[in-house]
Amino acid sequence: MAQQVNEWLIALAVAFIRPLSLSLLLPLLKSGSLGAALLRNGVLMSLTFPILPIIYQQKIMMHIGKDYSWLGLVTGEVIIGFSIGFCAAVPFWAVDMAGFLLDTLRGATMGTIFNSTIEAETSLFGLLFSQFLCVIFFISGGMEFILNILYESYQYLPPGRTLLFDQQFLKYIQAEWRTLYQLCISFSLPAIICMVLADLALGLLNRSAQQLNVFFFSMPLKSILVLLTLLISFPYALHHYLVESDKFYIYLKDWFPSV
């Protein structure tokens, strides 16, 4: 009886590694978003229950403690969890970058606040975009999609196997980073153009009426223009990411056969 309990505990520990690694990068599963680390650990523990019998049947615990092979097992699980979390966190990082860029252009970078979603200092628009994306993520079934990827990863990459750092892996990471910056620019570009035009108009106004302090109402004017532009462009804001996400499958198909 004691041996079976130990085997189940070892299987639970192995099953817990991959979701824990995923939560370290995915903003929605961080302790700041869920309220406390204890609550986050409870959520992650519940995510491991569906795959716990599968890991127990693989008898991985027979190899634990006999040599140092468990180090490779833990490293492989961490790499897989980080890879899934990195892909899922790209949109959240991109909208936070877009918000910080817009606040920099409108001169409101001193109003930074703590964003519990990404657990870092962010701007006002960055927090707004992050909360908006969280709502869209849950409404559109993004969390279900992430869980499907997590559980299907155990079918293609069971514990003991890991991803290879080959040329296809580098191409995939390069595509992810390129999409991160493209999504940031495409998300904030309409508002950037409006603010540049507003700065040009205020500059011409200052040349014609030098007694008028245009900097006094430049920030409120640009803030209103940014909000109006974003309200108009929100339906098309994440379209670029949906288009680019189809290209990810091409890199995944080239990468996974080498595993």
From Swiss-Prot:
It comes from Salmonella typhimurium (strain LT2 / SGSC1412 / ATCC 700720). This is Secretion system apparatus protein SsaT. Part of a type III secretion system. Keywords: Cell membrane, Membrane, Protein transport, Transmembrane, Transmembrane helix, Transport. GO terms for biological process: protein targeting; protein transport. The chain crosses the membrane at residues 9-29, 35-55, 78-98, 127-147, 185-205, 214-234. It is found in: Cell membrane. The keyword Ligase does not apply. The gene is ssaT. The keyword Hydrolase does not apply. NCBIfam families: fliR_like_III, PRK15349.1. One of its GO terms (cellular component) is plasma membrane. It is a multi-pass membrane protein.
